[in-house]
């Protein structure tokens, strides 16, 4: 906005001034001068000063006399009392005694110092500020303090970037700015035709050779403590008249014989000057040497009164101010840490806590409320958090979950074949064998299938693919004979809305039963699995919540039909029989499709009538949002039924598993039947949460023909780690065990004991290193554990799950916000990996990057590094490059419109790596953003550093930077609650200066 567009406050000030002056003017108008208009004769003395009847100047003191009054100007003013004018102490040759700037104020003056200096205790001299003491001056490598300023320096092989703080690795070849011999003292800019152009940092001038930079008085006062003059040879230093030059030619020392001198040239008259000097010599005032006060001086009727600002205490001499160590008293009021600084103190918090805006209290950071904290479940603890994985998954990299390959550990406990599946596994048997009830052992099949066993069916539910999944299981006890051929097929139905349910298949006798082989006992035996993935549709009247929204539902039905070898005839061989059965199966599927389409597919489970409907049910606003499958309402929340219970739809609550059943998972709608022992008197326990709770099972180290008592101990040379098994595993290689009833391979008497990272080979009787992609944390094992999911190890012989790493490069690249992430973060990244990202923002937008922290091992001699350039060329303009660990955050803008980013690691040491967020902003704000990120105050305070590490606060800042209109989403109160006052003041001053540059 131009000047003409601003409000002109002149008229308002005139009205205000008139109102302030009106009462005194009225009093003066009614006052009578002494000796006029009074009655003759002796009268009581009137105190004109007390009644305000005097005509002394506003800057004068009124002293009552027996017959009148006397006016005299206050210290710091001159005149005869009825007219007083301010003395300009800064106008003399000594500049008021100030070595830098002297600011005249009514009745007094104040000394100020240039940037890079601080006022000494005498209130006149200026001392250098050592910026390197606070957070290394914000320098990435080395900070060097100089008079009036500081400089960042880089280690050998690096040069200082444009932001004057970070260091960039030099290239060995090429003619661009990335070459170590480009010749520029400060800033190198790419020029046309492959050449370079040099520029200097603010406060320096480019030398005639167009390469070197000459210091001027505009940068750090030219390195001079007091006065600086620019000459052809550079800055020339001089000292205030009351000081003498140090031998270093820059510092100034106080003279011992200095006295205050007043010359005729800087006084109104010689007489007035003499009076003023005499008065100040006779009476100590704040106008002379600040009254001797360290900080604040105030003239009173009894002389000067010294006081100290908050954070200091006045000493016994009544002049000196001493810093108060607030941390010595009740820890400064800080919850955790207190750090004393000159004139104040800072509170800090332990890791995992954040400082609240009162800048004293610490609050636990709820990491679980942030995005991307854990792959599956997150558990918040005071000061930390823990990730947990769903059943069938293993935690790696602290926060990630990968599928567990159960088959890699003792073949999953399977007697014959183990097949790993996502989130689970299953045991299978060779032809001629059937799976035992314990789902691990295999039993030889003898004779034909029985025809009189009534099937038992249950529905198993759990989380799958982000939703609820229900799996129909048959426990009919019907087994396949060795001459049976299996035909499998599946069909999927898609519906708009439905409810998981289960009922006998007799609902479709007209089509389904005739389609099945006649030699089998029941159609129900043909349902091997039915997979229902849907919303339960269960509504709880009267409970608070939103009405459920229509959801799509998928029902996958998988049929497994059996054909018997005895059906083969001379005219139709086994292949012919299979084709006929497939034809019947397709007919059965068509019948089922029609039933679903006609809404004749009705199922029932646990007292609930659960239907499949083509139209979504009507819901009232009072009806609560439906809970997931296997969940009930408790205190207006959906709670999964715990292990050992199931959800009963009729009673709408969790019920204990009845005798003879068990359930080892949460959120189920049925209980599994306990295996039936030959001894019918075996103990059955209600609320069984595991198969072993059913009672009567053989214990680890034991076995029997059916897995139930009576049991035998595993023979010498065998072991069994699980309960309810029908056999024991051999040690192999002719190895014996230390005793009967062994429960693990570690009980086998091997010739050598293998250390972690190895497994015992029973053929060669040697210890073999675990191959790449596996690990073994224990002694004396005969296997190695496969790494979870898509992870692998860097080398063979791994001993811990932490050595399993995901090699995928992480990150999300958006037009406005995004992040890049090293592989396996926050776990250690893998060896010999390479990642590249390209950030190409929309037109007229620039890139701001925040590196909260980065962990790269310095021991590798820069074998692992992160670099950000304009292009992949090593000679292109580089914005950032590092090969070290920095736990102190830094923010910077890209030197180019787009960024090519590369992370590379060698085969040496590893570390956590990084997660680096970025935001793109309107290029019109370039000057403002640069001003903010280059200000050392952004990083000086540990509290400010924590802001740049706080994912929630960074997200809010980036949200506003990317889309400024989002600023209005945050109220002023919210902003104050999110950020400390010092941070808001810093940003407000810079934004105000950016928006109103002429004020």
Swiss-Prot record:
Domain comment as written in the entry: The CUB domain is important for the interaction with the cholesterol-anchor of SHH. The CUB domain regulates protease recruitment and activation during SHH shedding.
SUPFAM superfamilies: EGF/Laminin, Growth factor receptor domain, Spermadhesin, CUB domain
Annotated compartments: Secreted; Cell surface
Subunit structure: Forms homooligomers. Forms heterooligomers with SCUBE1. Forms heterooligomers with SCUBE3. Interacts with SHH via the cholesterol anchor of the dually lipid-modified SHH (ShhNp). Interacts with PTCH1. Interacts with VEGFR2.
Gene: SCUBE2
Organism: Homo sapiens (Human)
Role: Lipid-binding protein required for SHH long-range signaling by binding to the dually lipid-modified SHH (ShhNp) and by promoting ShhNp mobilization, solubilization and release from the cell membrane. Acts by enhancing the proteolytic processing (shedding) of the lipid-modified N- and C- terminal of ShhNp at the cell surface. Synergizes with DISP1 to increase SHH secretion. Probable cell surface coreceptor for VEGFR2 involved in VEGFR2-mediated angiogenesis.
Glycosylation sites: 659
Protein's recorded name: Signal peptide, CUB and EGF-like domain-containing protein 2
Disulfide bonds: 49-62, 56-71, 73-84, 90-102, 98-111, 113-126, 368-378, 374-387, 389-401, 407-418, 414-427, 429-442, 809-835, 862-883
Modifications after synthesis and translation: N-glycosylated.
Reported tissue expression: Expressed in a broad spectrum of adult tissues.
Domain EGF-like intervals: 45-85, 86-127, 128-168, 177-213, 217-252, 286-321, 323-363, 364-402, 403-443
């Amino acid at each position: 906005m131009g000047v003409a567009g601003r409000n002109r406050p002149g008229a308002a000030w005139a009205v205000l001034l008139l109102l302030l002056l009106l009462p005194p003017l009225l009093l003066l108008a009614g006052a009578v001068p002494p000796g006029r208009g009074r009655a003759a004769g002796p009268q009581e003395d009137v105190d004109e000063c007390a009644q305000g009847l005097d005509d002394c100047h506003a800057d004068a003191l009124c002293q009552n006399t027996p017959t009148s009054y006397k006016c005299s100007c206050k210290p710091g003013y001159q005149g005869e009392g009825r007219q007083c004018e301010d003395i300009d102490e800064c106008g003399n040759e000594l500049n008021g005694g100030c070595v830098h700037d002297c600011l005249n104020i009514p009745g007094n003056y104040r000394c100020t110092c240039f940037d890079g200096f601080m006022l000494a205790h005498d209130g006149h001299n200026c001392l250098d500020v050592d910026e390197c003491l606070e957070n290394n001056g914000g320098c990435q490598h080395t900070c060097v303090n100089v008079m009036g300023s500081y400089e960042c320096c880089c280690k050998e092989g690096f040069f200082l970037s444009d932001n004057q703080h970070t260091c960039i690795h030099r290239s060995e070849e090429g003619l661009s700015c990335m070459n170590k011999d480009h010749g520029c003292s400060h800033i190198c800019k790419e020029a046309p035709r492959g050449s370079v152009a040099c520029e200097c940092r603010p406060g320096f001038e480019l030398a005639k050779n167009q390469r070197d930079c000459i210091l001027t008085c505009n940068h750090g006062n030219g390195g001079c403590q007091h006065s600086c003059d620019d000459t052809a040879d550079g800055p020339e230093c001089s000292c205030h008249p009351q000081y003498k030059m140090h031998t270093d030619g820059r510092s100034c020392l106080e003279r011992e014989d200095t006295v205050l001198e007043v010359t005729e040239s800087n006084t109104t008259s010689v007489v007035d000057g003499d009076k003023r000097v005499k008065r100040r010599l006779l009476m100590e005032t704040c106008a002379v040497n600040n009254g001797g006060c360290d900080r604040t001086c105030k003239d009173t009727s009894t002389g000067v009164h010294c006081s100290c600002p908050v954070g200091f205490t006045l000493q016994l001499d009544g002049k000196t101010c001493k810093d108060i160590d607030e941390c010595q008293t009740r820890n400064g009021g800080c919850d955790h840490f207190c750090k004393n600084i000159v004139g104040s103190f800072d509170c800090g918090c332990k890791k995992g806590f954040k400082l609240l805006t009162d800048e004293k209290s610490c609050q636990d950071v709820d990491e679980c409320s942030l995005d991307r904290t854990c792959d599956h479940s997150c558990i918040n603890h005071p000061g930390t958090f823990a990730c947990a994985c769903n059943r069938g998954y293993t935690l790696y990299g602290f926060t990630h979950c990968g599928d567990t390959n159960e088959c890699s550990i003792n073949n999953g406990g399977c007697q014959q074949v183990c097949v790993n599946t996502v989130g689970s596994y299953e045991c299978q048997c060779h032809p001629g064998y059937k799976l035992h009830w314990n789902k691990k052992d295999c039993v030889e099949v003898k004779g034909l299938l029985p025809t009189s066993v009534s099937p038992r069916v249950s529905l198993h539910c759990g989380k799958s693919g982000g939703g609820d999944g229900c799996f129909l299981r048959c426990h009919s006890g019907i087994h396949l004979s060795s001459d049976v051929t299996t035909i499998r097929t599946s069909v999927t139905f898609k519906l708009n809305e439905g409810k998981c349910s289960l009922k006998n298949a007799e609902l479709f006798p007209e089509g389904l039963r005739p389609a099945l082989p006649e030699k089998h006992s029941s159609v129900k035996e043909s349902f091997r699995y039915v997979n229902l993935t849907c919303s339960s549709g269960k509504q709880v009247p009267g409970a608070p919540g939103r009405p459920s929204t229509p959801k799509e539902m998928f029902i996958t039905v998988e049929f497994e039909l059996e054909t018997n070898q005895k059906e083969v005839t001379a005219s139709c061989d086994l292949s012919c029989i299979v084709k006929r059965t497939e034809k019947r199966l397709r007919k059965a599927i068509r019948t089922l499709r029609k039933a679903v389409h006609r809404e004749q597919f009705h199922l029932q489970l646990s007292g609930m009538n659960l239907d499949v409907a083509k139209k979504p049910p009507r819901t009232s606003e009072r009806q609560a949002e439906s809970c997931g499958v296997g969940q009930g309402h408790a205190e207006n929340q959906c709670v999964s039924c715990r292990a050992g219970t199931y959800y009963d739809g009729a009673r709408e609550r969790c019920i204990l598993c009845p005798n003879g059943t068990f359930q080892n998972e949460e959120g189920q709608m049925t209980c599994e039947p306990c295996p039936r022992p030959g001894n019918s008197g075996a103990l059955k326990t209600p609320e069984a949460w595991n198969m072993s709770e059913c009672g009567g099972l053989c214990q680890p180290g034991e076995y029997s023909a059916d897995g139930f008592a009576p049991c035998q101990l595993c023979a010498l040379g065998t072991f069994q780690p699980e309960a309810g098994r029908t056999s024991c595993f051999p040690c192999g290689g002719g190895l014996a065990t230390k005793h009967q009833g062994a429960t693990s391979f570690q009980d086998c008497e091997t010739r050598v004991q293998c250390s972690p990272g190895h497994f015992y080979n029973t053929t060669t009787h040697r210890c073999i290193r675990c191959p790449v992609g596996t690990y073994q944390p224990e002694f004396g094992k005969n296997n190695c554990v496969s790494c979870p999911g898509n992870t692998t190890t860097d080398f063979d012989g791994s001993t811990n799950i932490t050595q399993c790493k995901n090699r995928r490069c992480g990150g999300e690249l958006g037009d406005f916000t995004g992040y890049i992430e090293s592989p396996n973060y926050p776990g250690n990244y893998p060896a010999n990996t390479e990642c590249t990202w390209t950030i190409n923002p929309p037109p007229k937008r620039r890139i701001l990057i925040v590196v909260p922290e980065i962990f790269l091992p310095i021991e590798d001699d820069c074998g692992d590094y992160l670099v950000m350039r304009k292009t992949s060329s090593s000679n292109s303009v580089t914005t950032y490059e590092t090969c070290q660990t920095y736990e102190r955050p830094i923010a910077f803008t890209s030197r180019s419109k787009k960024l090519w980013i590369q992370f590379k690691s060698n085969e040496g040491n590893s570390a956590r790596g990084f997660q680096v967020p970025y935001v793109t902003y309107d290029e019109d704000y370039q000057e403002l953003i640069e001003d903010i990120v280059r200000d050392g105050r952004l990083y000086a305070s540990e509290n400010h550093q924590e802001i740049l590490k706080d994912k929630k606060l960074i997200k809010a800042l980036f949200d506003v930077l990317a889309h400024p209109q989002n600023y209005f989403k945050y109220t002023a109160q919210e902003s104050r609650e999110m950020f400390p006052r010092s941070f808001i003041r810093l940003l407000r001053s810079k934004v105000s200066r950016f928006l109103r540059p002429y004020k």
